[in-house]
C-alpha cells in the first residue's frame, strides 16, 4: 500500500503532498503520518521551509474522512503529534509552512490551511467551513480565521458555512 503522504526534499525545501484518492480526506492514520512528517521538518536544521499541497486539481482536502467516521473512527481519535493534519497543534514549529491550495478546501482541510503561514490558492480553489450545517463548530477555524481576516467576515463564514472562491479569499486577506 502506498503512503497517503509523499515528501520530496529540494535543498532546504520540503514539499509535502497529501495523496488520498478520491478527495484527499484525512483519517487518523493519515493525520499521524502528517504529524511525523512536520515534526521531522521542525527538527531538521537543514530544512528551512515546507510547502503543503495535495494531489490532483479538484480537491485540496475536505478535512476529516467521513467514510472513516462511518466505519467507526471517533471524531476525537488520536491524530498524533501536531493534532489533526499534523500542523494544528505542533509545538515549537518556528519555520514557515506555505500551503498551496489547488482545489476545494473545506472543513478540516481549510483549518489545516489556516495553520500554515502563507496560503497560495489556484484560481479555481474554494473554501468553506460547512460544519455549522451539521450542528457543529469548526473549532480550530473559530480561533484561527478571525486572526487572519476581519472578524465580521470570519463570523459569517463560521456561522453560515458559505463558500468563498479564491478571489474573495484574496480580497479578505487570506
Predicted ranges, named:
Residues 16, 52, 65, 112-113, ...:
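Hydrophobic/aromatic residues within transmembrane alpha-helices
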Residues 1-4, 35-39, 82-88, 105, ...:
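A generic local structural motif
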Residues 1-57, 72:
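Conserved CoA-thioester-binding segment of acyl-CoA-metabolizing enzymes
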Residues 24, 57-58, 143, 155:
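Glycine-centered loop/turn positions within well-structured domains
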Residues 91-174:
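Crotonase-fold acyl-CoA enzyme core
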Residues 30-33, 54-92, 133:
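Glycine- (often His-adjacent) and acidic-residue-rich active-site loop
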Residues 28-29, 64, 111, 140:
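Generic recognition of short, well-ordered alpha-helical segments
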Amino acid at each position: 500500500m502506498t503512503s497517503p503522504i509523499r515528501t520530496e526534499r529540494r535543498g532546504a525545501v520540503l514539499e509535502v503532498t497529501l495523496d488520498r484518492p478520491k478527495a484527499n480526506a484525512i483519517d487518523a492514520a493519515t493525520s499521524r503520518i502528517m504529524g511525523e512528517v512536520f515534526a521531522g521538518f521542525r527538527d531538521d536544521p537543514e530544512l528551512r521551509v515546507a510547502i503543503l499541497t495535495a494531489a490532483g486539481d479538484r480537491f485540496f482536502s475536505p478535512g476529516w474522512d467521513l467514510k472513516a467516521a462511518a466505519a467507526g473512527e471517533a471524531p476525537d481519535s488520536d491524530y498524533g503529534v501536531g493534532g489533526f493534519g499534523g500542523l494544528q497543534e505542533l509545538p515549537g514549529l518556528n519555520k514557515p509552512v506555505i500551503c498551496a491550495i489547488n482545489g476545494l478546501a473545506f472543513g478540516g482541510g481549510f483549518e489545516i490551511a489556516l495553520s500554515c503561514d502563507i496560503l497560495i490558492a489556484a484560481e479555481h480553489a474554494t473554501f468553506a467551513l460547512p460544519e455549522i450545517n451539521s450542528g457543529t463548530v469548526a473549532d480550530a477555524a473559530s480561533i484561527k480565521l478571525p486572526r487572519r481576516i476581519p472578524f465580521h467576515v470570519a463570523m459569517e463564514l463560521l456561522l453560515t458555512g458559505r463558500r468563498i472562491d479564491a478571489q474573495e479569499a484574496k480580497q479578505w486577506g487570506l
